[in-house]
Amino acid sequence: MKRTNYAGDTNEQQVGQEVVLKGWVAKRRNLGGLIFIDLWDREGIVQLVFNEKENPEAFEIANAVRNQYVLEVQGKVQLRAEKEINPDMKTGKVEVAVDEVKVLAKSETTPFDITDGVDASEDLRMKYRYLDLRRPEMMRNLKLRSKVASIVHNYYDNEGFMDVETPDLTRSTPEGARDYIVPSRVYPGHFYALPQSPQLFKQLLMAAGVDKYYQLARCFRDEDLRGDRQPEFTQIDTEMSFATPEDIQTVTEGLIKRVMKEIVGVDVKTPFPRMEWQEAMDKYGSDKPDTRFGMLIHDLSDIVKDSSFKVFANTVADGNYVRAIRVPGGADKYSRKDISKYEEYIKRFGAKGLAWVKVTADGYNGPVAKFLNDQVAQINEEMDAKEGDLILFVAGSFHVVSDSLGYLRRAIAEELDMIKPDQWNYLWVVNWPMFEYDEGFGKWIAAHHPFTMLNEEDLHYLEDGEDPHKAHAQSYDIILNGNEIGGGSIRIHDPKIQEKVLKALGYTKERAEARFGFLLKALTMGMPPEGGLAFGLDRWVMLLAQADSIRDVIPFPKNSKAVEPLTAAPGKVSEQQLDDLKIEFDEKIDYKLDQDPDEQ
């Protein structure tokens, strides 16, 4: 029988009509002469009714089915009895009185219940991902992701962009994260790399005259495992010739506005606010500021530089900073023990301690209160502090202070429920530094990437004798509720400027040519001024769906150890495959996928 409609689309307009439905048994209830089955498909659930007196044959089959059996049913849509109406279900006013039923597939007992709020470990859910995706919450996420992707294609097509695919097998040009490399059988000892982004190819498309490009690009980064990072992800990738930052931002805002309206039902106001990178770091302690709440950071360096608290005075004398946040009403909410936990946590950012005072009617209470008697009035005025507030101080370098207070600000706001739900605060962070110092690599790197154009007034910093690390770039990140969802820039189209930027990053001419020669050559052959932006589809969909994890909006994700439990990837390959690739190992390697490689 041909299906007439999805189970979840059954409605009051079909009352009295015969329907054919196909789906899974979500729940079954036997009330003696009546059996009720909740039939599920991707659009939702409808209640089936089997009446022993009216149709004993169908009743007998229904009596034998179990959860997750696949059924085909034919029956008539009818209104539920008044007391049986379920206002929480889309189909809650109707049910289907079944005339015929056929079991299309049976199911063993599943390893966990196929319901929202399932009590199962994430790895177990991922091992049986095809079952996990049957849960209504997960199917909603998949549908939302599909709808967003559809809007993206439609929007950029209407804006005159061309959907152009770029290679997935390309040359290794690692910048920051490691490449995933693919050995060549045809050329032993040579390797392709999976793209970390289509960056260089989309610039070459501008050189080709494509003018406006976009694609939903698959990207791969062999990064250290932490948080919600995924080794493979999807980004909405765009590039425009002859464009200013404002042009690119306006087009991007148009997409966001449409997605928010159609997906969330919210009409966001454009243009979005713009915030300088320096302001974001100074006031929010983050280059992805969360503007849904206050508790801004205040610089108290000038106020405490002459205090009797030597830690503060010496920090300022060394050219560093003393900054603080005020927790409204925090004096009664946080004990010394609570504050000590935060102090331990911020040590990971390089902070040596967390000073604090509680504001009282007579001044301050706390470990450093006696050292700040002469500064109480100034500090209170600067921070608008009132009796009952808690003030937290961090002293140190710019990044130590910013990172520490930025973390504290967000953690405390979440703990005290200061963030209103259903707020959608988009903004642009602009005017980034061109370069930043990477403590891990022990060298200067590009804050975005080496192909970002500097501000015109900062080009002189690339000349000999100047300090290039003072330069700022024509770059911009799009932020949503304290999450970076994308970033972009105007690109360098002048080969001389590109050579100087690579030199500032420590590239010799030979190394630059070996790694980026194809791009450097393209810059000499009529490269137009151009720029673009890419933002992560996965993270954006996670925020739109208000999901707990990015893994909840990816059909088949990797876990936090970069393992896919469903297929047990990564896996070993045969000796023959290794021989074909001319690959051999110096020693036997036998990793277990349930352990971290570093622990084996």
From Swiss-Prot:
It catalyses: tRNA(Asp) + L-aspartate + ATP = L-aspartyl-tRNA(Asp) + AMP + diphosphate. One of its GO terms (cellular component) is cytoplasm. Signal peptide: none annotated. The keyword ATP-binding applies. Keywords: Aminoacyl-tRNA synthetase, ATP-binding, Cytoplasm, Ligase, Nucleotide-binding, Protein biosynthesis. GO terms for molecular function: aspartate-tRNA ligase activity; ATP binding; catalytic activity, acting on a protein; nucleic acid binding; transferase activity. ATP binds at R221, D222, E223, Q230, E484, G536, L537, D538, R539. It is found in: Cytoplasm. InterPro entries: Aa-tRNA-synt_II (IPR004364), aa-tRNA-synth_II (IPR006195), aa-tRNA-synth_II/BPL/LPL (IPR045864), Asp-tRNA-ligase_1 (IPR004524), Asp-tRNA-ligase_1_N (IPR047089), Asp/Asn-tRNA-synth_IIb (IPR002312), AspRS_core (IPR047090), GAD-like_sf (IPR004115). PROSITE patterns: AA_TRNA_LIGASE_II (PS50862). L-aspartate binds at E175, R221, H448, R491. It is an enzyme of class 6 (ligase). One of its GO terms (biological process) is aspartyl-tRNA aminoacylation. Its EC number is 6.1.1.12. Pfam families: GAD, tRNA-synt_2, tRNA_anti-codon. Catalyzes the attachment of L-aspartate to tRNA(Asp) in a two-step reaction: L-aspartate is first activated by ATP to form Asp-AMP and then transferred to the acceptor end of tRNA(Asp). PANTHER family: ASPARTATE--TRNA LIGASE, MITOCHONDRIAL, ASPARTYL/LYSYL-TRNA SYNTHETASE. Homodimer. This is Aspartate--tRNA ligase.
